[in-house]
Curated annotation (Swiss-Prot):
Alphabetized InterPro entries for the sequence: Kinesin-like_fam, Kinesin_motor_CS, Kinesin_motor_dom, Kinesin_motor_dom_sf, P-loop_NTPase
Signal peptide: none
One protein family per Pfam: Kinesin
A cellular component term, taken from the record's GO annotations: cellular bud neck
Location of this chain's protein in the cell: Cytoplasm, Cytoskeleton
One biological process term in Gene Ontology: microtubule-based movement
Gene3D superfamilies registered for this protein in UniProt: Kinesin motor domain
Species this chain originates from: Saccharomyces cerevisiae (strain ATCC 204508 / S288c)
Family to which the UniProt record says this protein belongs: Belongs to the TRAFAC class myosin-kinesin ATPase superfamily. Kinesin family.
Domain Kinesin motor: 27-364
Protein name: Kinesin-related protein SMY1
Other remarks on this protein: Present with 1920 molecules/cell in log phase SD medium.
Described purpose of this protein according to its UniProt entry: Possible microtubule-based motor that can interact or substitute with myosin 2 (MYO2).
Amino acid sequence: MHWNIISKEQSSSSVSLPTLDSSEPCHIEVILRAIPEKGLQNNESTFKIDPYENTVLFRTNNPLHETTKETHSTFQFDKVFDANATQEDVQKFLVHPIINDVLNGYNGTVITYGPSFSGKSYSLIGSKESEGILPNICKTLFDTLEKNEETKGDSFSVSVLAFEIYMEKTYDLLVPLPERKPLKLHRSSSKMDLEIKDICPAHVGSYEDLRSYIQAVQNVGNRMACGDKTERSRSHLVFQLHVEQRNRKDDILKNSSLYLVDLHGAEKFDKRTESTLSQDALKKLNQSIEALKNTVRSLSMKERDSAYSAKGSHSSAYRESQLTEVLKDSLGGNRKTKVILTCFLSNVPTTLSTLEFGDSIRQINNKVTDNTTGLNLKKKMDLFIQDMKIKDDNYVAQINILKAEIDSLKSLHNKSLPEDDEKKMLENTKKENIKLKLQLDSITQLLSSSTNEDPNNRIDEEVSEILTKRCEQIAQLELSFDRQMNSNSKLQQELEYKKSKEEALESMNVRLLEQIQLQEREIQELLTTNAILKGELETHTKLTETRSERIKSLESSVKELSLNKSAIPSPRRGSMSSSSGNTMLHIEEGSEISNSPWSANTSSKPLVWGARKVSSSSIATTGSQESFVARPFKKGLNLHSIKVTSSTPKSPSSGS
């Protein structure tokens, strides 16, 4: 299997939408923890620590300290702890901000850096007397998650990874030692995500479940702190916590991961310090720290000088070592990184090198963004798009229907009375009316002028005919006008009917849309609930599998211990029930020993084989009379002694 150690694979029901770059620059925080000086009593210290200003002043008053630095150099860090600081002081400054970042969906990294035996493992992992940052973070994190689950109803799942990098090879610390094999690292070209093939994550549901895995890491840390060179004490230790939180109320999903990295000594190893290693092994041992220094140097130069293009150099530096491959996202990526420097103030070269490394890495800016997405967002977006398509199709169909009705009304109106013909008819009617008025006026004048004269029959007939024709034309025009008015009224009624029908359809569509929106909200709630339940089921399933594997491992260990215990020889007493020998006591009918009290109530049997083993030293084999004392049985007869001789046997004395 492949395991993504940079960002946990998100559930298929959630997806991040393409948005604007909301990342914020965040420089790598550097914390210095000084170890008490040795060998500089009654002399002015070379390094002056100011825990209030968080500065370290380097002074070269001693001429024996050869260095290329100036006489006075000041190093500024985010926090400086002097030699009087305790574990509680360091944890008070670090633990709660780290946990708040994890709970808010940010990725984080804590790295310890410094020379060997300067307190790196002690600060990160701790000891039996004083816990370090790692167990304190785990305990506080679970307390907060469980509290949020009780008060807010949030659900969560936690998984852990633990591996070490030794000689440019990665090993899983959560598998038994005989089964540990080198693992392969793989990083896709388009993403920052790093995958470790065949690594075994452990899913935990409480701090009690996590303690056994923390103990495995503590064992490695103690091995490194003690400098046990028979083991891989010169290895880099990486412990990862992945936290997934589901907020049902706000309908959001938060994914965050935390690296806790304990590096081996930052000094360069050679034959004087590692006499048992070959030159190739020493080269691989120094390769990871050198690659880390080169990467930090390249990135800090890029930050100091914007014109400096370090793209090629630091990209190649990432690939120089598996350590830098693992820490790639912590150096300039999407992580809030904190580096804890530990050093001996009495050792000027190593302390100065450590301070310079801290000054360089502090100039690197990471682009940090929270890993918060909508719960079940992909399915909701698919549902939303599907609903929008349905609504669009509904609106398009409604528009097409209305367009068709308008076209039909226009065609009916055009068929009943073309617009041009109607205008012409109205104009002709107006002209005829004007002519008729003029004719009536002329006729009226003629009649008025000829009232005293005798009317001309011919003129009267012509006038009468003209008036009759005009009256018929007027009647026809009025009839056509009435018909047109009736047609217009019918069209108006049809238009009003269509409008009322359209309003009814619109109101029906509104009601349907309201029903669709209601069903959509119900479906979204169901999808959210299903996603939460699915996530919880997956979490419990993984937790069950992890516990089952843990139980099998413990059963196997118990079985091996029982077999080893049974294989250890133990002193045996001379008794009839001893299993130290394979000699069987053969008793036959008629033999003299069968008449002894030891064989009471057994003489009726023709042949009896002893049901217990006796040691080879329990029965005398010499020719002279020798005896042995048999221990009493736990059950049956209590026989004190049996005497066996090569001559005529005598009855042994009865013990009871």
